[in-house]
Amino acid sequence: MASLIYRQLLTNSYSVDLHDEIEQIGSEKTQNVTVNPGPFAQTRYAPVNWGHGEINDSTTVEPILDGPYQPTTFKPLTDYWILINSNTNGVVYESTNNSDFWTAVVAVEPHVNPVDRQYTVFGENKQFNVRNDSDKWKFLEMFRGSSQNEFYNRRTLTSDTKLVGILKYGGRIWTFHGETPRATTDSSNTANLNDISIIIHSEFYIIPRSQESKCNEYINNGLPPIQNTRNVVPLSLSSRSIQYKRAQVNEDITISKTSLWKEMQCNRDIIIRFKFGNSIVKLGGLGYKWSEISYKAANYQYNYLRDGEQVTAHTTCSVNGVNNFSYNGGSLPTDFSVSRYEVIKENSYVYVDYWDDSKAFRNMVYVRSLAANLNSVKCTGGSYNFSIPVGAWPVMNGGAVSLHFAGVTLSTQFTDFVSLNSLRFRFSLTVDEPSFSILRTRTVNLYGLPAANPNNGNEYYEISGRFSLISLVPTNDDYQTPIMNSVTVRQDLERQLTDLREEFNSLSQEIAMSQLIDLALLPLDMFSMFSGIKSTIDLTKSMATSVMKKFRKSKLATSISEMTNSLSDAASSASRSVSIRSNISTISNWTNVSNDVSNVTNSLSDISTQTSTISKNLRLKEMITQTEGMSFDDISAAVLKTKIDMSTQIGKNTLPDIVTEASEKFIPKRSYRILKDDEVMEINTEGKVFAYKIDTLNEVPFDVNKFAELVTNSPVISAIIDFKTLKNLNDNYGITRIEALNLIKSNPNVLRNFINQNNPIIRNRIEQLILQCKL
């Protein structure tokens, strides 16, 4: 059978030609390239007497909490919270646009009985009735819609932090109300937002709206301790507009020199542009189901001006800590479903590797005092239409996250041709409005950024900032920094593998099932498997050797090795003791059902939690003790052979990776069964178990004890036609006991007959198995 190729690889993968081994050692040999390092020659290490260095403050990064500023009158910018620190009772601030918006906030100290108080607001004397029976301060927001109307109390903030906030954003005025520490925001409409000015009577701070979570934290919990000392002196607001004169914002400073070495401090203002990459994979069948929507790394190259100099930059954006979501509209073939789609949220990170062609990146090996500051950016998702054949299309829409700088490290960035010493900027995430949903489904009001359309039509997202580092470089600029180990850049091979994977996956639609069954029954050896490649016999032999070396490290080969050791230990244990416990220990080497008698009698739910491991072990046992029926590995090997013959991109370098990947990834959803008399016990990788009678195909209770006994002594059979398909076939067409038994045993001749008769249920099942053969 076709799965013979896997057994041959398992058997032969531990022996390789001596010539190939020597060749491999030679290619992986490290080489030291050195120059005369002066007084450091004896240690071969970089100098350890570092200079103190200098790191200039950035002028491009907004602080989170800017202030305090002195009381003043001004027209606030949109998208900035004004955080006012009230220190006495009376009017805190007045704000108006002289058309449809007048508001004044007055502070009332704790424990005040109802009383009329006089306040001067907008140049008028007004009398407000106030009261406060709380232990906290109250801030009454008095509002009127025109100059002729009287003020009324629109909302109240009860606070022990004595902080008040106001924001211009989205055509509305936003303030806080409620009681700390659970105060929340609310808004008021206005037709003339731009003309709103504010008179502030206390010290205040300015916070960008991108840091609204921090503003919320300050309102409810108070300012950081450092802001509550007498050493913090409020400045005039005009200080924000001072133009700082600097000799050079992008500079290289020599810190120290020793022999051939010098320390250089590099300060750079940078503009980071990046984009998200994604992959959308649609399942086969009728066109209503999607396999996955996932993030993938994306490169972006661009130019920008820095101090009048044209800079060429390259970035790679990747994500970590994604959250897996799914949607299942039903079990019918025409029900829309997405098996997995990735979303980045607060627990995720975004990495952006940055490189440019400036001096700072030429000798980035020995680096210290690496620091950076970057602005935040909001990334908003767009729409993606799931183009189903019939009916209104579901649409994934929305979602947003804000990226906040969280650290910087050194990294290596791979392009199609070279590797680049880069800086990796790490960003933490906060979710933002709007939420995302899938229209025409039950998925609504979820937060995060899904991978369906993370760029929202934008060519890139942009972040500005600054970094500084001190690098140890040769004094003579013509020298290159010593490289301790030679590194082979395999990006070209990775690109070939990516193209080959895409080609392999697209070829699934072109495989004829009747030919596949015939091919699955052939005893494929390594020569016949690889002979479809246009090459000589010598090259085929060389490729087979390369495949065996790669296959030796595969999960399948590792599992076989572990299983052999485990069974040897169990056999020796059983020979020393005839107790039930020892026998069960032998059983559990195949099933992982139990370690002792009490565990064997566990419930059905207990075994379901272990079916993934059990199914893997059942695959190994079936491979070692193969029956006459067809196995999943026969189909897997036959599909692999077919795709190798049809491929135009397969070659000596890519074949080992493809064969190894196929053994691990082809047909991930498998079912295995054990046959005893007229009863069948079936288990699959999705955590489901079945027991049923051959004659009627009616389910019976799944006996864990019986399964544990049978799995040791009975042959394991691939459930090519699983129980659900058998049941469906019997209900719609009716099958005899002999046909049912042959399908249960995965008899290839019976399978071929059903396929030749164009039986839609059997054909659909085989098609689904072929479509699972993806890399």
From Swiss-Prot:
Name a GO CC annotation attached to this entry: membrane
What InterPro entries does its record include? ConA-like_dom_sf (IPR013320), Rota_A_VP4 (IPR042546), Rota_VP4_MID (IPR035330), Rota_VP4_MID_sf (IPR038017), VP4_concanavalin-like (IPR000416), VP4_helical (IPR035329)
Q: Where is this region: Hydrophobic?
A: 388-408
Q: Name one GO biological process term.
A: virion attachment to host cell
Spike body and stalk (antigen domain): region residues: 247-478
**Motif, YGL motif: chain positions:** 447-449
Classification via SUPFAM superfamilies: Concanavalin A-like lectins/glucanases (SSF49899), VP4 membrane interaction domain (SSF111379)
Which residue stretches belong to region Spike foot? 509-775
Q: Where is this region: Spike head?
A: 65-223
Q: Which parts of the chain are coiled coil?
A: 483-510
**Marked site: Cleavage:** R230, N231, R240, S241, R246, A247
Q: Where is this motif: KID motif?
A: 643-645
Q: List the disulfide bonds.
A: C317-C379
Motif DGE motif, chain ranges: 307-309
Q: Which UniProt keywords apply?
A: Capsid protein, Coiled coil, Disulfide bond, Hemagglutinin, Host cell membrane, Host cytoplasm, Host cytoskeleton, Host endoplasmic reticulum, Host membrane, Host-virus interaction, Membrane, Outer capsid protein, Viral attachment to host cell, Viral penetration into host cytoplasm, Viral penetration via permeabilization of host membrane, Virion, Virus entry into host cell
One Pfam family cited in the UniProt record for this chain? Rota_VP4_MID
Question: Further notes on this entry?
Answer: This strain probably does not use sialic acid to attach to the host cell.
HAMAP family found in the cross-reference section:
Rota_A_VP4, Rota_VP4
Q: Which family does it belong to?
A: Belongs to the rotavirus VP4 family.
Its protein name is: Outer capsid protein VP4
The species this protein belongs to is: Rotavirus A (strain RVA/Human/Japan/KU/1995/G1P1A[8]) (RV-A)
Q: What is the lineage of its organism?
A: Viruses, Riboviria, Orthornavirae, Duplornaviricota, Resentoviricetes
